[in-house]
Amino acid sequence: MTHWLCFTLALVAVRGVLSEIQLVESGGAIRKPGDSLRLSCKASGFTFSDTWMAWARQPPGKGLQWVGEINGNSETIRYAPEVKGRLTISRDNTQNLLFLQISSLKPEDTATYYCAR
């Protein structure tokens, strides 16, 4: 029996006082266990390169789980213990993009994924 994993992304938009802060995620898909997946988050409305960015996820019927975070110059990256070694967080400050690469997908990776600042 083949199991399928579902990855969804949420659009997060926060209105700022002088500008609109937006985080727009993409890359969600249905994958099989063992596959890999790359999620992206396009940021605007703030100085991306100066900002710590994070990924979180919410499995169906469960609470929000912190996945990891990365500082502005990518020198410091932290991961939740349960995902360390299978997830890679990176960023491209020239394009204001945040990435989450997930390898060796497991059923417990099924969740809605969020990027945050």
Curated annotation (Swiss-Prot):
<dbReference type="GO" id="GO:0005576">
    <property type="term" value="C:extracellular region"/>
</dbReference>
<dbReference type="InterPro" id="IPR050199">
    <property type="entry name" value="IgHV"/>
</dbReference>
<feature type="region of interest" description="Complementarity-determining-2">
    <location>
        <begin position="69"/>
        <end position="85"/>
    </location>
</feature>
<feature type="region of interest" description="Framework-1">
    <location>
        <begin position="20"/>
        <end position="49"/>
    </location>
</feature>
<dbReference type="InterPro" id="IPR007110">
    <property type="entry name" value="Ig-like_dom"/>
</dbReference>
<protein>
    <recommendedName>
        <fullName>Ig heavy chain V region G4</fullName>
    </recommendedName>
</protein>
<feature type="signal peptide">
    <location>
        <begin position="1"/>
        <end position="19"/>
    </location>
</feature>
<dbReference type="InterPro" id="IPR036179">
    <property type="entry name" value="Ig-like_dom_sf"/>
</dbReference>
<dbReference type="Pfam" id="PF07686">
    <property type="entry name" value="V-set"/>
</dbReference>
<feature type="region of interest" description="Framework-2">
    <location>
        <begin position="55"/>
        <end position="68"/>
    </location>
</feature>
<keyword id="KW-1015">Disulfide bond</keyword>
<dbReference type="GO" id="GO:0002250">
    <property type="term" value="P:adaptive immune response"/>
</dbReference>
<keyword id="KW-0391">Immunity</keyword>
<dbReference type="InterPro" id="IPR013783">
    <property type="entry name" value="Ig-like_fold"/>
</dbReference>
<feature type="region of interest" description="Framework-3">
    <location>
        <begin position="86"/>
        <end position="117"/>
    </location>
</feature>
<keyword id="KW-1064">Adaptive immunity</keyword>
<dbReference type="InterPro" id="IPR013106">
    <property type="entry name" value="Ig_V-set"/>
</dbReference>
<dbReference type="GO" id="GO:0019814">
    <property type="term" value="C:immunoglobulin complex"/>
</dbReference>
<keyword id="KW-0732">Signal</keyword>
<feature type="region of interest" description="Complementarity-determining-1">
    <location>
        <begin position="50"/>
        <end position="54"/>
    </location>
</feature>
<keyword id="KW-1280">Immunoglobulin</keyword>
<feature type="disulfide bond">
    <location>
        <begin position="41"/>
        <end position="115"/>
    </location>
</feature>
